From Swiss-Prot:
One of its GO terms (molecular function) is potassium ion transmembrane transporter activity. The chain crosses the membrane at residues 7-27, 50-70, 96-116, 132-152, 165-185, 210-230, 244-264, 282-302, 334-354, 360-380, 391-411, 416-436. This is Probable potassium transport system protein Kup 1. It catalyses: K(+)(in) + H(+)(in) = K(+)(out) + H(+)(out). It is found in: Cell inner membrane. GO terms for cellular component: plasma membrane. Transport of potassium into the cell. Likely operates as a K(+):H(+) symporter. HAMAP family: Kup. It comes from Rhizobium meliloti (strain 1021). The lineage of its organism: Bacteria, Pseudomonadati, Pseudomonadota, Alphaproteobacteria, Hyphomicrobiales. The gene is kup1. Keywords: Cell inner membrane, Cell membrane, Ion transport, Membrane, Potassium, Potassium transport, Symport, Transmembrane, Transmembrane helix, Transport. Belongs to the HAK/KUP transporter (TC 2.A.72) family. It is a multi-pass membrane protein. InterPro entries: K+_transporter, K_trans_C, K_trans_N, Kup. Its main location: membrane.
Length: 622
């Protein structure tokens, strides 16, 4: 009984978070699919063919690929592109560069989606006010801007207080959406022919080029499917699957069937079939409910962007940024000020640049289809490397999906000149940023490793009794380093400038595992190097906060007890100088240095006590 109750609670939560985006697609998907074929009048067979395409897109891409297959391809319960990438990197042999590029491409495309989704969904909901009264037409964009500004403003306060309402509100949305669709199916029962895939195939065959263009709009029905996989860790596989089959899929199917039947009976309703299905007395409540649903969908995408960025930082794809927890009970509720500001300006720019959901819908789709293609390619590697499927089995299983998604991608590429270039530019920008950071840090590590002094040699030299030996002082010093085999720069500079060495010196390395979380018993390890030097290692999962001060307490089991007030933390601060011979172009050197300078201070990122931190600087030519 308790398990059943927990399943229901998690399923309800997933309705609000996981399915918010795909649940708002009926607002505009069918409307946009009708536009390319409506210039010379739309026949009944064309309408049935369109609805058939939508239903089968939901069935093949969402139900089969995501709900039934990808939810099983988890990294210790976590999903998402970067989580899958981290899992594959463990056993990758010889083609890590390809996997890395695919991973950052998927992540970059998701960021583009996170900008477009709030703008498109909120605009499409608020535009329903035009049908309430045409006098409000000029206020659609200002109202949408105010709603979006409020949404981004409250992020720093956290959404814990209102997140409990997300599931119930979105459930009401799906019930209303499914009910209004069910009612209007009676307008023309011939719409049930849409379940026959013959009508979908016939539409594409008969329409030719226009049919390919229409596919770009049909794909809007499955936008948000990536959220199923990305939010796997928050809710688990069974609740997400249960919510899809009992609530979301039936409601979406009923609504699309209802819209199709409604337009078959009322061809003049093609301008906005979703809202026109509602009677006039219910139109304003429907607009309000739709707006609430789009706000919740936008919140889910923003939260997903925060989570994805944290993963990218911990995996070394982005520089450190400030990360704040907005809930004492939910570790997944985080706030990244830099990402929030970037998304806010990006969303505002899109609203003002396009001005309507109709115009913005042309830009939508490329980022989502691109991300889906990336996920399918990574899934192929997953089947081979993790499930040990023969290559031809894996190819045979995923080739139909890959071909279908590639066709959708091609259809969306036709919209580049109408605004489709926007998500491509956004994704390209973030690919360059992540590639530059990864490449720059690798070059920096190689250069410093080349000039660094091996730690073992250093310990022998300082512990040798001589008149040049540093003065021994009481207390404990912890030196943070990324390379435990080399002497930390801060330790060298401390001896060079202060001529002292503490009684106890700990060389601390912080590593990020290719798993979401690391058990506490595996978090820390100790290796004694000499009487005065000890090597410490902390290991965190890519979904965890790297709180060094808190993790120090775990060393007690190894017989080490740290008194924070008598312990000094030594950090090296590098002043990077560009070098024409670095291996990167000059512009990339400059970008890497700018990213490094923008990174948050390590003492803040690792939660070190600020009054116990000593930073020692050095120049490094990159």
């Amino acid at each position: 009984m308790e398990n059943a109750r927990r399943l229901l609670v998690l399923a309800l939560g997933s309705v609000g978070v996981v399915y918010g985006d795909i649940g708002t697609s009926p607002l505009y998907a069918f409307r946009e699919a009708l536009r390319p074929v409506s210039h010379d009048g739309v026949t009944d067979v064309e309408i049935i063919g369109l609805i058939s395409l939508m239903i089968w897109a939901l069935t093949i891409i969402v139900t089969i690929k995501y709900v039934l297959f990808l939810l099983r391809a988890d990294n210790q319960g976590e999903g998402g592109t970067l989580s899958l990438l981290a899992l594959l990197m463990k056993t990758a042999n010889g083609h890590t560069a390809i996997l890395f590029f695919m991973g950052i491409a998927g992540a970059a495309l998701f960021i583009g989606d996170a900008m477009i989704t709030p703008a498109l969904s909120v605009l499409s909901a608020v535009e329903g006010l035009k049908l309430v009264t045409p006098a409000l037409s000029d206020y659609v964009v200002p109202i949408a801007v105010v709603i979006l500004l409020l949404l981004f403003t409250v992020q720093s306060k956290g959404t814990a207080a209102v997140s409990n309402f997300f599931g119930p509100i979105t459930l009401i949305w799906f019930v209303v959406m499914g009910t209004i669709g069910f009612v209007h199916i009676a307008d023309d029962l011939s719409i049930f022919r849409a379940f026959n895939p013959y009508y979908a195939a016939s539409f594409l065959f008969n329409e030719g080029y226009v049919g390919i263009v229409v596919l770009g709009a049909v794909f809007l029905t499955v936008t948000g499917a990536e959220a199923l996989y990305a939010d796997l860790g928050h809710f688990g596989r069974r609740p997400i699957q249960w919510a899809w089959f009992t609530v979301v899929f039936p409601a979406l199917t009923l609504n699309y069937l209802g819209q199709g039947a409604f337009v078959l009976k009322n061809p003049e309703a093609m301008s906005d079939p979703f809202f026109l299905m509602f009677p006039k007395w219910a139109l304003l409540p429907a607009v309000i409910l739709a707006t609430a649903a789009t706000i919740i969908a936008s919140q889910a995408v923003i939260t997903g962007a925060f989570s994805l960025t944290r993963q990218a930082i911990h995996l070394g794809f982005l520089p450190r940024m400030a990360i704040f927890h907005t809930s004492e009970t939910h570790t997944g509720q985080i706030y990244l000020p830099n990402v929030n500001t970037l998304l806010m300006f990006g969303v505002m720019a899109l609203v003002f640049l396009f001005g309507s959901s109709e115009a913005l819908a042309t830009a939508y789709g490329i980022s989502v289809t691109g991300a889906m293609v990336v996920t399918t390619v990574l899934s192929f590697e997953f089947l081979r490397m993790r499930w040990n499927w023969p290559t031809w089995w894996a190819a045979g299983a995923l080739l139909p999906l890959f071909v279908l998604e590639f066709v959708f991608l091609g259809a969306n590429m036709l919209k580049i000149h109408d605004g489709g270039y926007v998500p491509i530019l956004i994704a390209a920008t973030f690919i360059v940023i992540m590639w530059t950071w990864k490449r720059g840090t690798a070059i920096l590590h190689a250069k410093t490793r080349h000039i660094d002094i091996p730690l073992a040699s250093f310990i022998k030299s300082v512990e040798r009794q001589s008149e040049h030996a540093p003065v021994s002082v009481t207390g404990t010093a912890i030196f943070l380093t990324s390379d435990p085999e080399s002497t930390p720069a801060a330790l060298l500079h401390n001896i060079k400038h202060n001529h002292v060495l503490h009684q106890q010196n700990f060389i601390l390395t912080i590593r990020t595992a290719n798993t979401p979380k690391v058990p506490k018993e595996e978090r820390v390890s100790v290796r004694r190097l000499s009487e005065r030097f000890t090597l410490l290692e902390m290991k965190f999962g890519f979904m965890e906060t790297q709180n060094v001060s808190q993790a120090l307490g775990l060393f007690r089991k190894s017989g080490l007890k740290f008194d924070i007030m008598s312990t000094s933390f030594y950090l090296g601060r590098r002043k990077l100088v560009p070098d024409a011979q670095s291996g990167m172009p000059h512009w990339q050197d400059r970008l890497f240095i700018a990213l490094a300078n923008a990174a948050i201070d390590p003492s803040d990122y690792f939660r070190l006590p600020t009054n116990r931190v000593v930073e020692l600087g050095s120049h490094v030519i990159i």
